[in-house]
């Protein structure tokens, strides 16, 4: 079904000083721009409008009132102080597409400013994907999402998704031709990705805007192409693995006009307004401006190695991020191939790291490498691809900061070869730095706030000293570093038991990015079952363990670091957990239960049913008095039901001391 929206007026009412309310006021409709923060709203009761302010008015006072059909829904008065002002609004609106009008008054100026855009309200769907125009990120399953994946070729090898998801990749984009006879194979990889929690950047090139590898279908007339496009969108628009529609590859190089691509875009959005549409651009990348009405996500594919400096990649990301700020997310396609055509060699693992981090530091909020064909075809270097997987885990760890909407604390670098950015999230400042040079560099950093203490060097299990806001470090050739500084004292949601027997109970040890430190893992029968740390969901601290079980009774089993048990002793075990029933291949099944099991060694286990909210689960296990097992024992966690769940703050204590254990206020 297509979108059928009633067009309604959504007006900003501006209160002007009496002396400025004259009939002779000039109207300027070009200086200010407005955009809803999200590409659409669905379940939210409140939203934000982004007001793009001209530079000469950054420090002018604006007075604004918001209303729909005369009803005021919000107001704002203030000095923006920067390019973008965030203005909250109430969204008590029915699904529709609204024309959003704005008039902006500037104190001391007898000029009325006007702007307009569209505000889209849709009925909520579990697989919907929003773009966040403020952060450049995505909202997937109601959570922040930083896409980090790769192109691949068709047919998709059956084991490819599971081989890559365990590294930390969360997205794939297969080149494919949309032929009726290959529909079964497309559905197969989509279903497998949904089981694994991977998303698919779905390639429609062969029946949409063209371009790309092997996308041409000989003899296909325009009418058939349109019919096949419509059928493909209808087939997969409700699929839980769908992330976005990819409709054109390098349109300038393939002589696809902006008008023709806009017509395709409008058709796709009419059929599926719940998912964004993307296009990839070749150099010159700023040609993408002409296609702004034909896409939701701007992508660029700079391939510099070995002829051009790799700073070309960061430069492209920075230019596009500046151009489309507040409007469109920017993704970069780093080069992960070489040795043929026009590219004499593929990038080294160091070059891949620098290109990737340059892109992200300069504003890219999606990474899609070109190209992956396993196990050692593209790229040929398994070490280079392992580095890409390592970065996938690192960026997953940094997602709350990269997609933070908090005002950051600026940080400067003392070297022109080192580019940096900073982000603030929940009182913790993250500083990302990357070396553009193929030689080691001393890095001197200054924070725009006086601070003395320690900065943790993430992913290296060390720290550096910060004195008065200044610190130094060494960056390897084309290397990157990430530093974290706690700017305020942590407010703990939950105090751990004083006699807790579990090491790293809150899963905060990130010595190896993405994986819990103090446990072993055992397969339950599916190689794609995962158990990553997730900084987006946690009951306390900064992390939980996210377990994804692809199919029933094929969960990974986590065996936590052992402790000494006592024959005849009883042990209380506690863990916090939640599930998301809307995710996974079977997400549409009504009344489907999610459950997990927790055990103490081989003595006993308890099964619990999960809910969609954080909840504490407690059990008690007694070790038999007459027992010939070794004294050391483990807590074992698994989730036999297919789906996704998060686990936090695992605790165990012998029940003889339980009152002292669970109340930190009680003394020995």
Q: Where do the protein language model's features map onto the residues?
A:
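Extracellular and organelle-lumenal recognition/adhesion modules and their flexible linkers in secreted
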Residues: 490-668
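Active-site clefts of carbohydrate-active enzymes
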Residues: 208-213, 320-350
């Amino acid at each position: 079904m297509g979108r059928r929206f009633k067009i309604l007026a959504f007006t900003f009412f501006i209160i002007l000083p009496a002396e400025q309310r004259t009939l002779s006021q000039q109207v300027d409709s070009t200086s200010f721009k407005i955009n809803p923060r999200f590409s659409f709203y669905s379940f939210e009761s409140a939203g934000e409008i982004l007001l793009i302010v001209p530079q000469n008015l950054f420090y002018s006072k604006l007075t604004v009132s918001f209303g729909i059909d005369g009803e005021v829904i919000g107001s704002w008065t203030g000095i923006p102080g920067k390019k973008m002002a965030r203005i909250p609004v109430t969204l008590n609106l029915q699904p529709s597409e609204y024309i959003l009008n704005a008039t902006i008054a500037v104190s001391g100026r007898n000029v009325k400013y006007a702007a307009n855009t569209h505000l889209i309200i849709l009925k909520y769907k579990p697989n919907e994907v929003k773009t966040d125009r403020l952060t450049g990120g995505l909202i997937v399953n109601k959570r922040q999402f930083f896409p980090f994946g790769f192109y691949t070729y068709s047919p998709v090898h059956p084991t490819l998704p599971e081989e890559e998801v365990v590294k930390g990749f969360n997205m794939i984009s297969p080149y494919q031709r949309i032929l009726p006879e290959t529909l079964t194979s497309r559905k197969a990889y989509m279903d497998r990705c949904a089981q694994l929690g991977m998303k698919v950047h779905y390639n429609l090139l062969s029946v949409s805007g063209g371009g790309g590898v092997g996308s041409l279908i000989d003899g296909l007339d325009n009418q058939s192409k349109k019919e096949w496009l419509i059928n493909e969108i209808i087939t997969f628009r409700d699929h839980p693995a769908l992330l976005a529609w990819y409709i054109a590859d390098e349109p300038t190089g393939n002589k696809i006009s902006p008008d023709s691509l806009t017509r395709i875009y409008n058709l796709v959005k009419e059929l599926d307004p719940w998912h964004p549409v993307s296009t990839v651009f070749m150099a010159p990348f700023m040609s993408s401006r002409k296609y702004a009405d034909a896409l939701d996500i701007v992508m660029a594919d700079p391939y510099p190695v070995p002829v051009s400096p790799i700073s070309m990649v960061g430069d492209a990301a920075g230019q596009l991020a500046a151009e489309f700020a507040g409007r469109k997310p920017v993704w970069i396609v780093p080069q992960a191939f070489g040795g043929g055509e026009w590219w004499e060699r593929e990038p080294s693992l160091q070059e891949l790291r620098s290109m990737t981090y340059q892109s992200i530091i300069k504003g890219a909020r999606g990474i899609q490498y070109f190209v992956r064909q396993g196990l050692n075809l593209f790229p040929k270097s398994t070490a280079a691809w392992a580095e890409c997987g390592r970065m996938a885990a690192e960026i997953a760890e940094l997602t709350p900061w990269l997609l933070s909407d908090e005002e950051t604390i600026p940080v400067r670098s003392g070297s022109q070869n080192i580019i940096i950015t900073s982000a603030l999230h929940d009182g913790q400042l993250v500083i990302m730095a990357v070396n553009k040079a193929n030689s080691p560099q001393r890095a001197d950093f200054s924070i725009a706030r006086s601070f003395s203490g320690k900065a943790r060097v993430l992913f290296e299990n060390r720290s550096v000293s910060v004195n008065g806001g200044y610190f130094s470090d060494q960056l390897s050739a084309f290397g990157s570093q990430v530093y974290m500084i706690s700017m305020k004292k942590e407010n703990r949601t939950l105090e751990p038991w004083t006699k807790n027997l579990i090491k790293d109970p809150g899963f905060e040890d990130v010595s190896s990015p993405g994986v819990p430190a103090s446990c072993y893992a055992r397969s339950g029968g599916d190689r794609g079952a995962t158990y990553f740390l997730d900084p987006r969901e946690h009951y306390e601290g900064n992390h939980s363990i996210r377990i994804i079980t692809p199919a029933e009774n094929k969960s990974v089993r986590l065996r936590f670091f052992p402790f000494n048990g006592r024959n005849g002793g009883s042990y209380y075990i506690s863990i916090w957990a939640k599930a998301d029933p809307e995710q996974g291949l079977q997400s549409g099944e009504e009344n489907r239960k999610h459950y997990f099991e927790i055990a103490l060694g081989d003595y006993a286990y308890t099964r619990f049913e999960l809910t969609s909210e954080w909840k504490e689960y407690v059990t008690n296990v007694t070790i038999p008095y007459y027992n010939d097992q070794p004294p050391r024992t483990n807590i074992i966690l698994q989730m036999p039901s297919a789906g996704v769940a998060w686990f936090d703050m695992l605790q165990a204590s012998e029940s003889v001391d339980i009152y002292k254990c669970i109340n930190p206020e009680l003394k020995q």
